[in-house]
UniProtKB/Swiss-Prot annotation:
It comes from the Eukaryota. It is found in: Plastid, Chloroplast. PROSITE patterns: IF3. It comes from Porphyra purpurea (Red seaweed). One of its GO terms (molecular function) is translation initiation factor activity. The keyword Chloroplast applies. This is Translation initiation factor IF-3, chloroplastic. One of its GO terms (biological process) is ribosome disassembly.
């Protein structure tokens, strides 16, 4: 029994503030054409909305007084959901893909890594190029930096350097991001 009560309380907080759910002493009212009608008590604004066969919907509670709009709530909710779906379609979650290699890499292996990185960049992901060292190889970190600069030069048509080659412990790291298409 207690479980139902908790859930019902949570649901009532998530409900949109329309008509009788608006609990402010005064609200600024905008009609369905977008014209300001003035500041009203919520009861008077609700009567005005019901005369037109529409709903009073709280648009912004951050301003003083809160802004309410007279509109068809069903249509308003549909357009909000449609906008959210469109925004979700356009959104691309770019993740960071890593390409690892050693500073003594052979030419063919290097080309394979370049191809991997270019595929990642073309799909809109960022690429973290990492060169790892073992033992005393760390003395040759300048060779690794030169190799990463060569990689950036080979990918200059599709990528831009977001983080220049730098040492990070036993690694040298560079971060590339896809170029913005205008």
């Amino acid at each position: 029994m207690l479980e139902k009560y908790k859930n019902s309380k949570k649901l009532s907080r998530d409900l949109p503030q329309i008509n009788d759910r608006i609990k402010f002493p005064k609200v600024r009212v905008i009609d369905d054409e977008g014209e300001q009608l003035g500041i009203f008590a919520p009861e008077a604004a609700i009567q005005l909305a019901t005369k037109q066969g529409l709903d009073l919907v709280l648009v912004s509670d951050k301003s003083d007084p809160p802004v309410c709009r007279i509109l068809d709530y069903g249509k308003y909710k549909f357009t909000q959901e449609k906008r959210a779906r469109e925004a979700k379609k356009k959104q691309h979650n770019s993740s960071i893909k890593e390409v690892k290699m050693r500073y003594k890499i052979e030419e063919h292996d290097y080309k394979v890594r370049i191809n991997q990185a270019s595929k990642f960049l073309q799909s809109g992901d960022k690429v973290k190029a990492t060169i790892t060292f073992r033992g005393r190889e760390i003395q040759h970190s300048n060779l690794a930096i030169n190799l990463l600069n060569k990689m950036a030069a080979d990918l200059v048509t599709i990528a831009e350097i977001q983080q220049a080659p730098s040492r990070d412990g036993r690694n040298v790291i560079m971060l590339l991001s896809p170029k913005k298409v205008n």
